[in-house]
Structures are given as structure tokens and as C-alpha cells.
């Protein structure tokens, strides 16, 4: 055993490589062992340090891979599972357990997160040389019972299936202990580099090999001062020093100091010594000069995007200044990889800098995983419509075009069908010939055929199920779709998709291994496949060696690259505080470590945090050979952040913080990096003058659209794709002639009028362009209203010989049997329940009709208007016609006065403010239309709410009181003529505010005609402004702004062009109610009509 240490500015790899070459010269075979995260990088570093640049006798590898290079004899032929296979095994065993058998984990026993944690615990216990039976020492009885039961079941299953347990390293340990290694240990040497601690498993391997006579050389970074200090707690080198002291004590071998004498202390050595003295409380006087500040720079940036742009510019500039440099001389370290990943690609592509981020990507969100998830959902939830749509949207199932998929989705949404039997029936329903049923049935068969074959599979052997799955992938054109999708991609993306496919196939291979010979149902297979894919990860390798490597800062080693940029070094990211997210708490780990024998040790992350983070900071400061840039943004993930305390310490030593900003106000030689980056800088430069006054704008895109829009306006140009504010064009004369020929009647409905005054452009979309809502065959508010209307229409038309209740029940029975309503309300249990609710509403509403002797109904569903009688005459002589349908016309028995009733599904009242602004013209329009047809004597126009009254029992003292209060809400709401009100009974809400004199009645009709005239003139002129109304002057109601995606209107930007409702001019603090409010609005109407 030979232990070495060196100062951090001397390359430990060079020293250990020389040791390795000397051992090779002595006839030894050398295994150069590096940590998992550094093994590939270390291989290149060792090759660069070798005098011959290569050696067949030196193998750079990891502890786990050593077994590959040693000859192991008489080992049982067991198949080794990786994490995917192990996850499948856990999933299977947990699925077989009854949730009641697990006291803690029963409810989440098949949750992917739990399975992932169980896998991690499995590996952790293997690495720590701990047996699962050691879990008996847990104090939590429920958790102990659950974990023991799970691991016992998984272990039994692995043994039964001849599947290897434990890691590759544990198999090597077992082979050495049982003398199953035939390799000559005297010819083997281990050189170990880059470790500051061994796991229990790694230490066991070193111990066994040392006992077999294998020569071992272990090196680490440490200063002589730290190594010889009697107190190392809190020292920067604490991790490596404790590691060396432990090994020296165990193997009775003092560590040798291999530090080199440097002619001059460089900037990074100076910073290291200052940091070390700060942490060991010793005094050290070193001056930091301008050269040091140039070599080790601390940047303070505003945002993460700005950081990346500054780094990209700096790299480009250095490459421009020195032709000997290449991309491989640069390294980028990230404080938080996930936060920078997307911006990194965008900005580095813009600056044309090739980079490689060596990070595994999860398959959980890949379309292939969503494809499997959708098929599982189809099987598990018995062919839900949404699951089939999700399957088609992956673009992996069948070779149908996007237009075919859209047409199929639209039709099945129209039908509202669920369940395989419903999809197996031939499509026959069409809405007035809107759908191409022949084509849709062809699509239905193409989509269903592969799924039907697959879903017909019964529980069978895993091998047979995999064959059927393979056939399904071919028949469903999944492999073909993947190939077609990748052919149009760039080479890098094609490689990425190839890795995804490999990962997918690997999950299937592991499934075949774990379930070989077992009977598996299709649903279990799909669930296992989805679980395996959710756990899977894939990664690509760089296409060329000459790239900028990007990695997390905590994986860095000293002297890694010439130029290193470490960004995102905020207080939250540096240092990284490891959190324990496993199934065992730190306290439980401590108890297990105390209860087990020596050498068996679970890692307690919190106890390692301080020494690990200090050593990481030391490695970070020494990661560069020439220049190091440490940066922290003021805004990190859109939240304010502070720079790391370690950076503040360096500033305290004399290094300077540099405020770095992207300057778009001028161009400099630093912008001459690449064509794309220069173009971007020019665009930003020309925008700067416009953008300087718009700091409140939320997004760059909105700012950009305004800037370009203004530029175009100045030059008399127009780009409809990026308007400065949403606007519409007046329709051309020939278009208007085609829409509204002079000889053809122009019709305007009351609903069209309301839509026009809500938002003129909404009227254009719905009534001119004919924009429709998506069709639905299932019952909706419209069908509910028609159903109730039909019941009352029929009930009131039946002869009076029978009681009203009998007539109502007969009407309910006959209406329910009509083909239209029978098809809708018998389709599903949900529809049947809806029908029962509607019938309750009908019976409740019938109460008003049953007990109202003062009136008689003379007409139901009465049509009004038409070409015979113009509603209004425009100034140009053109007539405007109004036609519609009144739900019911009543007549007072006393004097024959006419009243109009409109059924509503919710409480609706006539409101003068809304009427004045064109938003409540329904009742006046009905009265005006009937008056033009010759009716002269009216008692009113009103709404009847068709709903069950709801009464809070807390607000009344008794049930009788609740009945009284409920009856109050069941009244006709609307407008009534004052002279007829005495004839109306208790069912009419005839307070003074709702009663009109003859003069007020005529004024109401005249103003209503005025509203129609204004709207008709604008419509016939082809002018439709984008002007949704605002009631409070601050926002737009959602039902008013239904077409935002089309118009682009945003209330927070374009409120100025909204239509502000006209209101009464009241003195401050004055509030009118009742009849005074009515009189005030009539006064305003007179002003508007100049009367």
C-alpha cells in the first residue's frame, strides 16, 4: 500500500501516471481506478500524461468494472439486472402484495417514486455491505415490517428466477472471498485517483485485494500544512486528509508528500492558500494584484440569460484572438443544470458554439412513453375517448395524416362515445351531412384493428405476449412512424431518437428476463412497460472531441481546462446542501450504523455536507489552468438571489466583483463572434431606442411586436402578423354587395344585436363568417332548454278537462318519447340522471302555471317578424327586419291585455344600464314586434326562471319559513305596464322600478329601435371594431372576450380601445335605487333621442 498526496496546483494524474508507468516497467498490469463521474475524462487525462501516449498494460476503469478484467471461475450462471429490471421486479412483487399487508406503503405501493426509492435503498445497502435483515434494527415497527416484507419478497423472487442480486462489485467481493478469481494477484496493481472517501463496498474490495498481495497506490490532494495539522475539522482539505489518515492508520503506511516546488505562486494557488488560512484560523499575508484579478474574475450579472450570453461572447472573443485555441480548451460549470439547460442550447446555437452537456435525460416525457401510457389507459379504463385521442396525438400510432386524425377526433367528440363496443359500431350519425361517414368508418377500422387484436390477448407467457406486442407495433405502424419522424431531423437529434429506441428495447429485454416463463396479463405487461420507461434514462455522446464540455460544478476536478466559466453560483447553489430524500431518515441510518458490525456503514449525507462542499470549492477555484470566471446572477429562476458566501470571501481577500451587462446601445469588436450573434446584436442595437421607455413590458415578444409595428407605421408599411394593437379592416364594397344585396332583406336578431354590442368583431365572426362552436351530440344547455320548452308547450296546449298536474305528466311522458329527446336522454346513465333533474325542474316550475287564474296562455313558441313587416327604416331607405320566436304569449282574462314570457334556465332580470348600452333588448324587441303585428294592449314582458329554488336552512327559523322564502323567488321578472299591474297576482315581481307608464313604454320601444338602427348601419357599412365592452373600466368579462386567440386583444395592453359602458352622471357619493334609478335612466334615454 502506497499513499501519496500533493498540493492542488500539481497534477495528481501526472504523478499517479508516472507511478503506473514504473509499475508497468516492473511487469505489472495496472488498473487505474477513477470515480464514476470522472472515469471517461480521466482516461483522456491519463493518455495525455503517458510518455508513449498509450499503454496496453494500463486500464483506466471504475471499481464496478474491474470484474470484467479478472477471470472468475465456477460462478453460478445468473443473469444480472440493471435498475430497469430491478424496478420491474419490485413492481411485480409489490403488485402481488395486498395493500392491507403494508401498513405504511400500502396506498402507494405501485407509485414510480416509491419504486425508485426502493431501488436506491437496495443499492445503498449493497454498497454499505449491509444485509436486508439488518433492517430489524429499525425502531419504527410499521416501516420495519413493510421494508422487511418487500425486500424478503423481492429477494425470494430473484433467487427463484436465478437472477443475480447485488452489484457487480459485490459479485467481485464474493468471488475474491471464495477464491474464485484465477487471475494472478501478484501481477495486478491498483492506482486509485480522485477519491476523498470509499463506500463500504469499495473499501472492502481494496481490503481484500491488499490482503491478496495486490500492490495499491492511492493519491489525493492535500497541503502539507493540512496533512500534518493535529486538528483538521473545518479545514478545506478535511475530506481528503481524513481519508488519507484513515488509510494510513488502517494499513500502517504513512502518506508521502509529492508536492512540487513552483517557481512562482499563481493566482489560483494564492486564492487556495488564502481560503485555507481563513478556515484553519491561521494568519497569512498575501497581496492580490491586478494580474490575479484578471486570472480569477468574479462576475455579477442580472439574469441567467445574460450570464450565458457573456460567456458565449467571451469564448468567441478568445477564439478570435488566439487561433491556437479550440473549443476543448473551455469548460462551463453550472450551479444548477436544470435551470440553464434550455437557455444554454438557444444561446450557444446562436453564437455557433458546439457544446456537450453530459446529462442523462428521462424518458418520462418522450412521446414513446406517452404512447405506452395511452394504450395502458385504454386497457385499464375500458377505452375512454380521451385516451384514444391522446394515443393518436403522439403521432406514433398509425400512419394517418394530421387532417384525418383531426377529423376523427372531431367526430368522436361530437358523438361523445366511450367504450370499445361503442367504437366497434358503424358510424351513422351526422349533423346535417357535416361529416364524411364513409371516410370516418375507414379511419375507425384502421385505428381499431391493431388495438382489438392486442386487447383480445389473455393472460399468457411473457414470451408470447412480447411476440403479440411486436406484431402490434408493426400493424400500428409505430416503427414506421418513428423512422419517418427521424428522417427529417438533424444528425444529433437522430442519434437522440436512436438512443430512445435502444432504451425502449432494453426495457422489453429486461421484462423478458424478469418474467421469463411467467404468466402475465396484458394490463400488467403495459403497466410494467410504462413503469420501466418512466424509470429509464438515455444520453448521447458528443459527435466530436472538439466541443465545449458543460457539467455541474460539483463534478469538477482540479486543473481540468485552460479556461473555466462557473455560472449560477448563487447562495442556493454554492454550496449544495444534500437533502436526504430516501426511505430512511438520518437518525435511522445512524442507529443502523451503530447496530451493525464495523465496516458496514450507510452514508449520512448531512454529516458529509460541510467537508464535501469545502473540498468542492477548493477544486472549483483550481479547476482552471489559465483563467477562471465565477459568476452569480441577481435574478435566478425569476426570483431575487444573492451570490454565494464563498465568492464574498474571495472578494474580501482582494479579488474584484465586476458588474457585467450586455450593452445593446453600441457595437464593439466583442460582437464580431459569429454571423448569428452579430445579427442578434444588430437587432438588439436598433431596438434599444424604442425599448428604453418600455421597461414595464412583460415579455420580449410583445416588446418586439410593438417596436417593429412602429417602424413599419413610420414607413407606411403594414404587417398584419405583428400589429401594434388589434384592429380590423372595413369590408370591401364587393364583399358587402355579396353579403347584403340591396334587393335582399337584411335580418338582425335580438341575440345578434346583443353580440354586436358586446363586441362588434364577435358579431362578425359568428354571424358573418359563421364561426361555430364544436358540435356535440350529448345533451347540453340548449337541448335542456328545448326539452323543458317542449314540455310546457305541450302541457298548455292540452284540453282543460284534466287537472294541470295530469296535463303536465302527460306532456312529460309524450315529450320524453319524442325521437330527438329519447336519443339524447337515454344514451347513458349520466344522461338519464340529467333528464330526471330536468323533470324535477319542470314540475317545480309548473307550480306557477298551476296557480295563476288571472291569465290564460294563448300561444306557445310563437314566431314573429318576417319580410311582411319591417322592424325599422334606415336613413338611406333600407329596411331592417327582425324575426324570432316567443316562448309564450299570455292574456289577462280581465281585459284581454297581452303579455310575453321568455323561459330562462337561471335568474334573469331586466336591467336599465344594460338595456341602454344595447345588452338587454330581448323583452322590448318582443313587445315591439308584436305591436307591429297589430297588438296594442299589453300588460308586460317577463322572464320565468326554470330552476329548482334553493333556500339556505340557516337563514330561516322553520321549514315552513323555507317554503315561504322559496316561493318568493318563483316569480315572473321583467317589465309591467302600470295601468295593468292591479290585475296581476302574487307571481309577478311588480315593484315600482319595474312598472312603466304608457309614455315610458313607448320611449323604451323607440330607444330599442334606435339601438337596432345604429347596429344595422355599422353592419351594412362593413365596420366591425375589436371593442369588447368593459363594465368596471379595468377588465373584460370572460364571456365577452371569447375570441381572444383570434383578435389578439389583451385587456392589460389594449383596454383603451374597449367600449366603456355609459353610466349615469351622478354626484360623488350619490346612489339611486328603485323608481328614482328608473327615472334617471329614462332621462338619459330622452337625452340620447333628443326629446
Swiss-Prot record:
Keywords assigned: ATP-binding, DNA damage, DNA repair, DNA-binding, Exonuclease, Helicase, Hydrolase, Nuclease, Nucleotide-binding
GO MF term list: 5'-3' exonuclease activity; ATP binding; double-stranded DNA binding; helicase activity; hydrolase activity, acting on acid anhydrides
GO biological process: double-strand break repair via homologous recombination
Top class in the EC scheme: hydrolase
EC numbers for this chain: 3.1.-.-
Record's keyword annotation contains Hydrolase: yes
Gene3D superfamilies from the UniProt entry: P-loop containing nucleotide triphosphate hydrolases
Superkingdom in the source lineage: Bacteria
Cofactor(s) the protein requires to work: Mg(2+)
Transmembrane portions of the chain: none
Alphabetical list of InterPro entries matching this protein: ADDB_N (IPR049035), DNA_helicase_suRexB (IPR014141), P-loop_NTPase (IPR027417), PDDEXK_AddAB-type (IPR038726), Restrct_endonuc-II-like (IPR011335)
Subunit structure: Heterodimer of AddA and RexB.
Misc note: Despite having helicase-like domains, this subunit does not have helicase activity.
Function in brief: The heterodimer acts as both an ATP-dependent DNA helicase and an ATP-dependent, dual-direction single-stranded exonuclease. Recognizes the chi site generating a DNA molecule suitable for the initiation of homologous recombination. This subunit has 5' -> 3' nuclease activity but not helicase activity.
Stored NCBIfam families: rexB_recomb
Similarity comment text for this entry: Belongs to the helicase family. AddB/RexB type 2 subfamily.
Protein name in UniProt: ATP-dependent helicase/deoxyribonuclease subunit B
Name of the gene encoding the protein in the UniProt record: rexB
Amino acid at each position: 500500500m502506497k499513499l501519496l498526496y500533493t498540493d492542488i496546483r500539481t497534477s495528481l494524474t501526472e504523478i499517479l501516471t508516472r507511478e503506473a508507468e514504473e509499475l508497468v516497467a516492473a511487469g505489472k498490469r495496472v488498473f487505474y481506478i477513477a470515480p464514476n463521474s470522472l472515469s471517461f475524462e480521466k482516461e483522456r487525462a491519463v493518455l495525455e500524461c503517458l510518455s508513449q501516449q498509450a499503454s496496453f498494460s494500463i486500464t483506466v476503469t471504475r471499481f464496478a468494472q474491474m470484474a470484467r478484467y479478472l477471470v472468475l471461475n465456477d460462478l453460478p450462471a445468473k443473469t444480472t439486472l440493471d435498475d430497469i429490471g430491478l424496478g420491474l421486479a419490485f413492481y411485480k412483487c409489490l403488485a402481488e402484495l395486498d395493500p392491507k399487508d403494508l401498513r405504511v406503503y400500502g396506498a402507494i405501493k405501485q407509485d414510480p417514486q416509491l419504486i425508485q426509492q426502493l431501488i436506491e435503498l437496495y443499492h445503498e445497502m449493497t454498497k454499505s455491505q449491509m444485509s436486508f435483515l439488518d433492517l430489524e434494527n429499525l425502531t419504527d415497527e410499521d416501516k420495519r415490517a413493510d421494508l422487511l416484507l418487500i425486500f424478503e419478497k423481492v429477494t425470494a423472487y430473484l433467487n427463484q428466477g436465478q437472477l443475480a442480486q447485488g452489484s457487480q462489485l459485490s459479485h467481485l467481493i464474493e468471488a475474491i472471498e471464495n477464491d474464485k478469481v484465477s487471475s494472478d494477484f501478484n501481477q495486478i496493481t491498483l492506482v486509485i485517483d480522485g477519491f476523498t472517501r470509499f463506500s463500504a463496498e469499495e473499501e472492502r474490495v481494496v481490503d481484500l485485494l491488499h490482503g491478496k498481495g495486490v500492490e495499491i497506490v492511492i493519491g489525493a490532494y492535500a497541503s502539507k500544512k493540512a496533512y500534518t495539522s493535529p486538528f483538521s475539522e473545518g479545514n478545506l482539505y478535511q475530506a481528503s486528509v481524513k481519508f488519507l489518515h484513515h488509510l494510513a492508520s488502517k494499513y500502517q503506511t504513512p502518506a508521502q508528500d509529492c508536492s512540487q516546488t513552483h517557481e512562482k505562486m499563481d493566482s489560483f494557488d494564492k486564492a487556495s492558500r488564502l481560503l485555507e488560512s481563513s478556515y484553519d484560523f491561521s494568519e497569512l499575508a498575501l497581496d492580490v494584484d491586478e494580474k490575479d484579478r484578471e486570472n480569477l474574475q468574479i462576475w455579477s450579472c442580472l439574469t441567467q440569460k445574460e450570464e450565458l450570453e457573456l460567456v458565449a461572447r467571451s469564448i468567441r472573443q478568445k477564439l478570435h484572438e488566439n487561433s491556437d485555441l479550440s473549443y476543448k480548451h473551455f469548460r462551463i460549470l453550472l450551479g444548477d443544470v436544470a435551470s440553464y439547460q434550455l437557455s444554454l442550447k438557444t444561446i450557444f446555437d446562436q453564437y455557433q458554439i458546439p457544446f456537450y452537456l453530459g446529462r442523462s435525460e428521462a424518458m418520462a416525457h418522450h412521446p414513446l412513453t406517452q404512447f405506452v401510457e395511452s394504450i395502458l389507459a385504454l386497457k385499464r379504463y375500458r377505452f375512454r375517448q380521451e385516451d384514444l385521442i391522446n394515443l393518436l396525438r403522439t403521432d406514433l400510432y398509425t400512419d394517418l395524416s394530421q387532417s384525418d386524425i383531426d377529423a376523427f377526433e372531431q367526430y368522436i367528440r361530437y358523438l361523445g362515445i366511450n367504450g370499445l363496443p361503442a367504437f366497434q359500431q358503424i358510424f351513422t350519425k351526422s349533423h346535417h351531412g357535416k361529416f364524411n361517414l364513409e371516410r370516418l368508418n375507414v379511419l375507425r377500422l384502421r385505428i381499431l384493428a391493431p388495438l382489438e387484436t392486442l386487447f383480445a390477448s389473455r393472460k399468457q407467457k411473457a414470451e408470447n405476449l412480447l411476440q403479440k406486442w411486436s406484431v402490434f407495433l408493426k400493424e400500428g405502424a409505430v416503427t414506421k412512424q418513428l423512422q419517418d419522424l427521424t428522417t427529417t431531423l438533424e444528425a444529433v437529434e437522430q442519434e437522440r431518437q436512436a438512443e430512445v429506441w435502444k432504451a425502449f428495447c432494453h426495457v422489453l429485454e429486461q421484462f423478458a428476463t424478469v418474467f421469463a416463463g411467467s404468466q402475465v396479463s396484458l394490463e400488467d405487461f403495459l403497466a410494467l412497460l410504462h413503469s420501466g420507461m418512466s424509470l429509464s434514462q438515455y444520453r448521447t455522446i458528443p459527435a466530436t472531441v472538439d466541443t465545449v464540455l458543460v457539467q455541474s460544478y460539483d463534478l469538477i476536478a482540479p486543473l481540468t481546462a485552460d479556461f473555466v466559466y462557473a455560472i449560477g453560483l448563487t447562495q442556493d447553489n454554492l454550496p449544495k446542501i444534500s437533502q436526504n430524500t430516501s426511505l430512511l431518515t438520518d437518525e435511522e441510518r445512524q442507529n443502523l450504523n451503530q447496530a451493525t458490525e464495523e465496516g458496514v456503514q450507510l452514508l449520512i449525507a448531512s454529516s458529509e455536507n460541510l467537508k464535501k462542499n469545502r473540498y468542492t470549492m477548493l477544486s472549483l477555484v483550481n479547476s482552471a489552468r489559465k483563467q477562471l470566471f465565477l459568476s452569480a446572477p441577481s435574478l435566478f429562476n425569476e426570483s431575487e438571489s444573492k451570490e454565494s458566501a464563498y465568492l464574498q470571501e474571495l472578494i474580501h481577500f482582494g479579488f474584484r466583483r465586476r458588474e457585467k451587462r450586455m450593452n445593446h446601445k453600441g457595437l464593439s469588436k466583442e460582437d464580431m463572434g459569429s454571423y448569428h450573434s452579430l445579427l442578434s446584436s444588430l437587432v438588439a442595437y436598433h431596438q434599444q431606442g424604442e425599448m428604453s421607455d418600455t421597461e414595464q413590458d412583460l415579455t420580449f415578444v410583445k416588446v418586439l411586436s410593438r417596436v417593429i409595428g412602429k417602424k413599419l407605421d413610420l414607413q407606411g408599411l403594414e404587417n398584419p402578423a405583428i400589429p401594434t394593437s388589434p384592429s380590423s379592416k372595413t369590408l370591401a364594397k364587393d364583399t358587402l354587395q355579396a353579403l347584403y344585396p340591396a334587393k335582399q332583406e337584411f335580418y338582425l336578431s335580438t341575440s345578434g344585436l346583443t353580440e354586436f354590442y358586446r363586441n362588434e368583431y364577435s358579431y362578425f365572426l359568428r354571424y358573418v363568417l359563421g364561426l361555430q362552436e364544436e358540435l356535440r351530440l350529448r345533451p347540453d344547455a340548449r337541448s335542456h332548454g328545448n326539452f323543458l320548452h317542449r314540455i310546457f308547450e305541450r302541457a298548455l296546449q292540452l284540453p282543460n278537462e284534466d287537472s294541470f298536474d295530469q296535463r303536465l305528466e302527460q306532456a312529460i311522458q309524450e315529450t320524453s318519447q319524442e325521437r330527438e329527446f329519447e336519443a339524447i336522454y337515454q344514451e347513458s346513465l349520466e344522461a338519464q340522471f340529467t333528464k330526471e333533474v330536468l323533470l324535477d325542474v319542470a314540475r317545480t316550475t309548473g307550480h306557477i302555471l298551476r296557480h295563476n287564474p288571472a291569465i290564460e296562455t294563448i300561444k306557445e313558441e310563437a314566431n314573429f317578424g318576417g319580410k311582411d313587416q319591417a322592424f325599422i327604416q334606415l336613413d338611406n331607405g333600407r329596411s331592417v327586419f327582425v324575426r324570432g320566436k316567443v316562448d309564450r304569449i299570455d292574456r289577462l282574462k280581465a281585459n284581454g291585455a297581452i303579455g310575453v314570457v321568455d323561459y330562462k334556465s337561471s335568474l334573469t332580470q331586466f336591467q336599465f344600464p344594460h338595456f341602454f348600452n344595447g345588452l338587454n333588448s330581448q323583452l322590448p324587441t318582443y313587445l315591439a314586434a308584436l305591436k307591429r303585428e297589430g297588438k296594442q294592449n299589453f300588460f308586460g314582458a317577463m322572464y320565468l326562471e326554470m330552476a329548482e329554488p334553493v333556500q339556505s336552512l340557516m337563514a330561516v327559523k322553520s321549514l315552513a319559513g323555507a317554503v315561504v322564502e322559496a316561493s318568493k323567488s318563483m316569480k315572473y321578472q321583467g317589465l309591467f305596464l302600470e295601468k295593468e299591474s292591479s290585475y296581476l297576482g302574487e307571481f309577478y315581481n311588480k315593484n315600482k322600478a319595474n312598472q312603466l307608464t304608457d309614455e315610458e313604454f313607448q320611449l323604451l320601444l323607440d330607444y330599442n329601435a334606435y339601438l337596432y338602427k345604429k347596429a344595422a348601419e355599422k353592419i351594412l357599412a362593413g365596420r366591425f371594431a375589436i371593442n369588447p365592452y368593459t363594465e368596471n373600466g379595468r377588465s373584460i368579462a370572460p364571456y365577452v372576450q371569447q375570441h381572444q386567440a383570434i383578435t389578439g386583444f389583451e385587456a392589460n395592453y389594449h383596454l383603451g380601445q374597449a367600449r366603456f359602458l355609459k353610466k349615469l352622471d351622478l354626484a360623488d357619493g350619490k346612489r339611486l335605487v328603485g323608481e328614482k334609478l328608473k327615472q334617471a335612466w329614462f332621462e338619459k334615454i330622452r337625452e340620447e333621442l333628443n326629446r
